[in-house]
Each structure stands twice: as C-alpha cells, then as structure tokens.
Amino acid sequence: MSLVAEAFVSQIAATEPWPENATLYQQLRGEQILLSDNAASLAVQAFLQMCNLPVKVVCRANAEYMSPSGKVPFIHVGNQVVSELGPIVQFVKAKGHSLSDGLDEVQKAEMKAYMELVNNMLLTAELYLQWCDEATVGEITIARYGSPYPWPLNHILAYQKQWEVKRKMKAIGWGNKTLDQVLEDVDQCCQALSQRLGTQPYFFNKQPTELDALVFGHLYTILTTQLTSDELSEKVKNYSNLLAFCRRIEQHYFEDWGKGRLS
C-alpha cells in the first residue's frame, strides 16, 4: 500500500468510532488452529482488551485464506479488514487508542526491539516446532492443519505449508538447527524478557503496552498447548516472573474464562 493510500485509510479509520460488532477471525479453536496462530490471535485479543475495545472472536476453517495477508488473526471493523498485530496496532492508533503514547522515544525504540526479539525467537521457534520437528509434525501438525478438509486435500495443504515454512527456515539460517538449539534460543529469549520485566507488573511499569500483549499471547499459548513433550513450556516455567505476568493478564483481561488455566 502506498503512503498516500495508507494516509487515506488512516483518515477514514480515525473518523469512525469503534463499532460494537467488530470481529476477529481465526481458525477453528478446538481441532485446527496451531500454536503459532493461536499465539498471534491471543496477542491481538489481549491488545484489544487492554485498549478496552470489544471484539467478537469468530472461528472459520478458511480464516487463513480469508486474510488479506494470508496470516491470522485479522479483524473486520466497519468496512476495514486488517491482519496481524502490527498493522492492527496502527489501525487502532488511528482511531485514537494507543497503549504506548505515554512512552518516550527511547522507551518506544526499546519496546520495538523486544517485540522484534519475540517475533524472531519465539514465533520462529513455534513455526520450527510445528513444521520441522518430525514428532510434532507427525503426531499433531498434519492432522490439525488439514482437519477441515477431505483426503487428499488435507495432506496436500499441510505439505504445501510445511514446504513454505521449511523454505523460510532455510532462508533465515534455521534450516539446519536441531530441536535442542531451538529450545536454547527460546530459553535465551525468556531470560531476556524476564530480566527486562523484573519485579514490575508490566514491561514498562504499571501500564501494559503492545509488547505485553505480544509476550502474553506467545507465552500463555506455549504454557497451555499440549505438544508431544513439555520441553518448550518448561523453558518458560523456569522464569517465575514470566509465569506471574501471564497469570496477571489472564486474571485481569480474561476473567470471563472462569478459573484460570494457569492457576
């Protein structure tokens, strides 16, 4: 999208209030959605909750193909469709809602750096586990990803996706990594996040930002998703302040879930 077009979209978005019927689309929750997409969806849900903006979550088998970027989640607000956390944050900001306006320029740069860390390490590790770890691929990924579709389409779509992810892994230098090396990267990422969080309730003290939403989305999903082993979730559990952070956001922003899954 050109800068002129982006500015025009921002102007339109800013003139319209947030509607009550805003919708977030993701894949089927129980039987289809994978770890990385679930984490991305939860991050956006957390961000909108933190902004006090209502959104209805709708699960569709073809959500990935409905998305303008081919990635989930995406939101449908008025006549606008926006996908992924970064563009959604900018879209919401154009409507006058921002979680990071109170930060100075140095803090904003730091926030963006940590968000890059999460995307480069945690998200990539999730994709690696889903599509490059043979045990996970064989026992979980193929069956879940293709679950809405008949044979042989279910396998064709899954293997196409696996090929895409493996090509990406090779391009970024993760193609020859072992699972142990990936888990070590996750541990280093969690260590950096734990040190930055310290004893604060949120990464920038008392108020959450989009960084908090992103970290929560990934860590909470890692902690609550059943995989072929507990190795990934155990890396997160080594950091008590990250666990407390996830519980805090779950209890404060997702109280309608009832008894917390991290209790």
Swiss-Prot record:
Which Pfam families does the entry link to?
A: GST_C_6 (PF17171), Tom37 (PF10568)
InterPro entries for the chain: Glutathione-S-Trfase_C_sf, Glutathione_S-Trfase, Metaxin_GST, Mito_Protein_Transport_Metaxin, Sam37/metaxin_N
- Note whether Cell membrane occurs among the keywords: no
- Localization (cell): Mitochondrion outer membrane; Mitochondrion
Query: Which residues are annotated as modified residue N-acetylserine in the UniProt record?
Result: 2
Q: Give any single GO term for biological process.
A: protein transport
Question: What Gene Ontology terms describe where this protein resides (cellular component)?
Answer: mitochondrion; nucleolus; SAM complex
Q: Which UniProt keywords apply?
A: Acetylation, Membrane, Mitochondrion, Mitochondrion outer membrane, Protein transport, Transport
Family designation: Belongs to the metaxin family.
Q: What is the role of this chain? A: Involved in transport of proteins into the mitochondrion.
- Subunit structure, per the record? Interacts with MTX1/metaxin-1. Associates with the mitochondrial contact site and cristae organizing system (MICOS) complex, composed of at least MICOS10/MIC10, CHCHD3/MIC19, CHCHD6/MIC25, APOOL/MIC27, IMMT/MIC60, APOO/MIC23/MIC26 and QIL1/MIC13. This complex was also known under the names MINOS or MitOS complex. The MICOS complex associates with mitochondrial outer membrane proteins SAMM50, MTX1 and MTX2 (together described as components of the mitochondrial outer membrane sorting assembly machinery (SAM) complex) and DNAJC11, mitochondrial inner membrane protein TMEM11 and with HSPA9.
Q: What is this protein called?
A: Metaxin-2
